[in-house]
Amino acid sequence: MRHFFKTTLYAIGFMSITLSNPSFAAKTETYNQLNLFADVFERIRANYVKDVDDEELIEAAINGMLTSLDPHSTYLNTKRYENMRVQTSGEFGGLGIEVTMDKGVILVVAPMDDTPAFHAGVKAGDYITKIDGEQINGLTLNEAVDKMRGKVDTDIDITIVREGESDVIELTITRAIIEVQSVRHRIEDEIGYVRISSFTEKTTSGLRDALKEIDEELGDNLQGIVLDLRNNPGGLLDQAVDVSSTFLDRGEIVSTRTRNDKNIQRYNAKPGDNIDKKSLVVLINGGSASASEIVAGALQDHERAVVVGTQSFGKGSVQTVMPLSTNGAMSLTTAYYFTPSGNSIQNEGIVPDVVVEQLRLNDSEAIRARRSEASLRGSLANPNATDEGDDEGDDEGEEDD
């Protein structure tokens, strides 16, 4: 009886400590949930009808945890992490499309210029539903991208659903080494035209080389520059900052803000406008995302450029790639982008100063033009909104293939 009494007092005392210490209670609940995970893991290993690989189970659990947050947080195993590092260097193998997951299938954000997918006729807003005859449903984004990659000069069959088209589109595309020449230029009369298709490590140097060649050819006859960011899915933040700085003398280009505005980082222009304040027009459309929107937003807010086209994609979140102990990494959404005027790009995009609809051959083009970050299930709400509502995350981030 005395032992029971002591035990009861101990239990009551433990409960009192727990109730009076919310953080302790929260930690206890977290540990209980981790124990639940371990319990499920062991039951699968012991009782599942087929043999399972421990590493694959854990990787699937990590993927599920990250992809439940928003469409852009994802796990990168060793192979995918290495692929990502190769992609940002500006040369990799694949088809040449920027993709994300939407409603269980692959959504094409934009095809990259002069790549196999581009020449095959893949368009922004297309849904890829099958790869080599296999349904995409049930695959993660990473698994689907892995299937699209392969040896150079081998063929892949993809099935595309294009809204506005009654029939599915079957394409056979030959894989190639994708050497992304992210900057191209030409001269039309006395106007310099510069096309940036993505933001890789070589983009800023490519832009400045292009401007130098234009200046050498036109000299004082140069009337202005057209900077084409249409169907540019984005890329490296530092390159977006440097490209913006190329046309600005001073001022903020973009700021990033973490949870509860605990950490605000501002990126400012360096002195020197490479085209001496000559006229600048920036072209955008619904395929202009992320880094493209940073450039367009900065030049628009500083009234340095006239932005022309249609509303951009609206991806205003920052993904930080965090290396893990397994030689893999996770890409985690850690902050929002804000333009110099304090506006968030998230789900809103950049609204052009002059709206010019692209030439469309049919209604499907109009439907594709409306594809945006906000249309993705699980997209994060705009932090400038007074009522953010609930986010329901069940899709994954973007990848190049």
Q: Model-found features: residue ranges?
A:
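C-terminal "post-core" interaction segments
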Residues: Y31, R184-D401
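Flexible, low-complexity junctional segments that flank or bridge functional domains
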Residues: R2-I225, N231-P233, E392-D401
